[in-house]
């Protein structure tokens, strides 16, 4: 589950990670009030107005701007709130901004020049261990750094038996070229950051940039946090941070009815039971010359009602030109799935106007085939995997 920057910073702050202070505002008036309060605390009249959407690259899209007085705060907040922000990580339509984060300006003058770093904590799936990835090239797209100057990216893997050890945090600070107060501050920052990552059951922390201020304080200026959905039962307060306005509407609807659905950009809808079979089915669609329009796992308890709900979700996508139903009946009874297909056709009528290829194998597959054959539906049946692929290819070539 993705959350907003300000929510991620709240989590970081609760574990002792120093953050760039700020207040959320939902209109220009609230933004001005937030700026006034920050001025009282910091003594500076400069503020940064940051659009709160679930997407990176906000600055490139005009979603992060500096305001040097209250008038500019009001103007910029009014301009950003309500806009459709287009970034390299959004669709062409962009995402509507409902709120902004009004923050303090932390690039103040002092004895030293401020310096930016990149740091993230994530699971290295190749080794099965958490890993801290960091670089001196903060404030930039880490993908660009990895491609052009990979030698500037460092990694530190953490043994799950011991957790992050002090010498590892010190090594990170050393590799970033820090010394004196900055070295001690970075060591403390890294230890607190990793504690926050573990105890919040997150799958990703990305801080870009981590800032060393002119007086050698280390703080998180930005925060991209992804929480593990499967652990939200342990964090009721985090679960309340979900902003469904930022999520795909069909995915939200699927979650509410207990289906695992991920929206994709292709033209062939797929309905499968089991994540492994779903992945194989998506490969099958690719080999047949199509592109998967979705990942949809109806689960091990698929019945007629769930199958009908699945069809409704798939057909919400106007790009879908065909649907492949690929079910292996172990616990799932194929006849129930077949009944769901028949019921969906009756209840949805003309909405089910795309070709449907059905492969039902396993428990009660013979009964399922009889149900579909006697239904009068224009459904293509397949027994073998390759046969299903051929029928998808045939449909797409028409």
UniProtKB/Swiss-Prot annotation:
Substrate binds at residues 273, 330-332. ATP binds at residues 50, 57-59, 106, 116. Mg(2+) binds at residues 208, 222. Residues 9-253 form the ATP-grasp domain. Pathway: Carbohydrate metabolism; tricarboxylic acid cycle; succinate from succinyl-CoA (ligase route): step 1/1. Its cofactor is Mg(2+). Its EC number is 6.2.1.5. GO terms for biological process: succinyl-CoA metabolic process; tricarboxylic acid cycle. Gene3D superfamilies: ATP-grasp fold, A domain, ATP-grasp fold, B domain, Succinyl-CoA synthetase domains. Binds 1 Mg(2+) ion per subunit. Transmembrane segments: none annotated. It catalyses: succinate + ATP + CoA = succinyl-CoA + ADP + phosphate; GTP + succinate + CoA = succinyl-CoA + GDP + phosphate. Keywords: ATP-binding, Ligase, Magnesium, Metal-binding, Nucleotide-binding, Tricarboxylic acid cycle. The keyword Phosphoprotein does not apply. SUPFAM superfamilies: Glutathione synthetase ATP-binding domain-like, Succinyl-CoA synthetase domains. GO terms for molecular function: ATP binding; magnesium ion binding; succinate-CoA ligase (ADP-forming) activity; succinate-CoA ligase (GDP-forming) activity. GO terms for cellular component: cytosol; succinate-CoA ligase complex. Heterotetramer of two alpha and two beta subunits. Belongs to the succinate/malate CoA ligase beta subunit family. Succinyl-CoA synthetase functions in the citric acid cycle (TCA), coupling the hydrolysis of succinyl-CoA to the synthesis of either ATP or GTP and thus represents the only step of substrate-level phosphorylation in the TCA. The beta subunit provides nucleotide specificity of the enzyme and binds the substrate succinate, while the binding sites for coenzyme A and phosphate are found in the alpha subunit. This is Succinate--CoA ligase [ADP-forming] subunit beta.
């Amino acid at each position: 589950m993705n959350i907003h920057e300000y929510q991620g910073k709240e989590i970081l702050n609760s574990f002792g990670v120093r953050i760039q202070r700020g207040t959320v505002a939902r209109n220009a008036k609230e933004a001005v009030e937030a700026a006034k309060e920050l001025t009282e605390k910091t003594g500076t009249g400069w503020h940064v107005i940051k659009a709160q959407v679930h997407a990176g690259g906000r600055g490139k899209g005009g979603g992060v701007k500096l305001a040097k007085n209250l008038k500019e705060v009001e103007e910029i907040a009014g301009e950003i709130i309500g806009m459709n922000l287009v970034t390299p990580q959004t669709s062409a339509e962009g995402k509507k901004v409902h709120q902004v984060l009004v923050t303090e300006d932390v690039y103040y003058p002092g004895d030293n020049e401020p310096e930016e770093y990149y740091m993230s904590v994530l699971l290295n799936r190749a080794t099965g261990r958490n890993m801290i990835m960091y670089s001196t090239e903060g404030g930039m797209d880490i993908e660009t750094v990895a491609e052009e100057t990979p030698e500037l990216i460092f990694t530190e893997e953490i043994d799950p038996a011991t957790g992050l050890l002090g010498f590892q945090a010190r090594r990170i600070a050393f590799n970033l070229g820090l010394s004196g107060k900055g070295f001690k501050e970075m060591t403390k920052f890294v230890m607190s950051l990793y504690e926050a990552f573990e105890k919040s059951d997150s799958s990703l922390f990305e801080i870009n940039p981590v800032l060393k201020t002119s007086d050698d304080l280390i703080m998180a200026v930005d925060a991209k946090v992804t929480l593990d959905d499967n652990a939200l039962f342990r964090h009721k307060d985090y679960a309340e941070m979900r902003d469904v306005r930022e999520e795909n509407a069909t995915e939200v609807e699927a979650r509410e009815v207990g289906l695992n659905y991920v929206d994709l950009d292709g033209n062939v809808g797929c309905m499968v039971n089991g994540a492994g079979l779903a992945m194989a089915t998506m490969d099958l669609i690719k080999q047949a010359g199509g592109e998967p329009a979705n990942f949809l796992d109806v689960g091990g308890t698929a019945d007629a009602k769930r199958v009908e709900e699945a069809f409704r979700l798939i057909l919400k996508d106007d790009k879908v030109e065909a649907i492949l139903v690929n079910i292996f009946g172990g616990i799932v009874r194929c006849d129930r799935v077949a009944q769901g297909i028949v019921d969906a056709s009756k209840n949805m009528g003309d909405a089910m106007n795309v070709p449907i290829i059905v492969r039902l194998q396993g428990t009660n597959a013979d009964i399922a085939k009889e149900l579909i054959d006697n239904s009068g539906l224009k459904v293509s049946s397949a027994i073998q995997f390759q046969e299903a692929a051929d029928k998808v290819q045939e449909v797409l070539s028409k």
